[in-house]
């Protein structure tokens, strides 16, 4: 099966610090890939490069033959603080050339259960900002959903809803790649685990293989 998304030798340094060593990664339809490892391991750098938000120093990211759509939920708020959630969604819908931006915004507000009470993006709680990030990422019905610690500020109910929406992307033939420090999320949702350490991949295998490996101690 042709991968939806492929990274070949991507790397990134900041001055003399190598944040990401040359790294290869293939993401296939139906996969839910967890990126785990200690802080500074290169997880967020890799996801940002996969999303096209950060240029690698070398290497490349290739999309599959069908040119899959990619949605990205960064760790930090990625919306306009002076706009309401509805205004943010309508703006991003127009940028993504989504048909009927107003209707799309209404649908996504309901989908992520985000209050439409007139508050600006900068006035939202961290949890609601994360839900708005997800709504923006889902606007174009992505085939690949990239998530950087997306549920860290969500309560248990919101977290379950978040993963229901991620599961819908997978179930329609897409894939999810997520950075997490949450062992429960890893065990419940991941089909594949990639462990990173010091800017490189030290393990890549199924969740069952991961649970039998020494790299499972990353959560110890």
Model-assigned labels for residue ranges:
Residues 174-179:
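Conserved H-loop
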Residues 145-148:
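Catalytic Walker B motif of ABC-type/P-loop ATPase nucleotide-binding domains
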Residues 90, 102-117:
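Conserved ABC ATPase "signature" region
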Residues 51:
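Helix-to-loop junction immediately C-terminal to a conserved catalytic motif
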Residues 186-188:
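A short, surface-exposed alpha-helical micro-motif characterized by mixed small hydrophobic
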Residues 36-38:
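The feature captures the beta-strand-to-loop junction immediately N-terminal to the Walker
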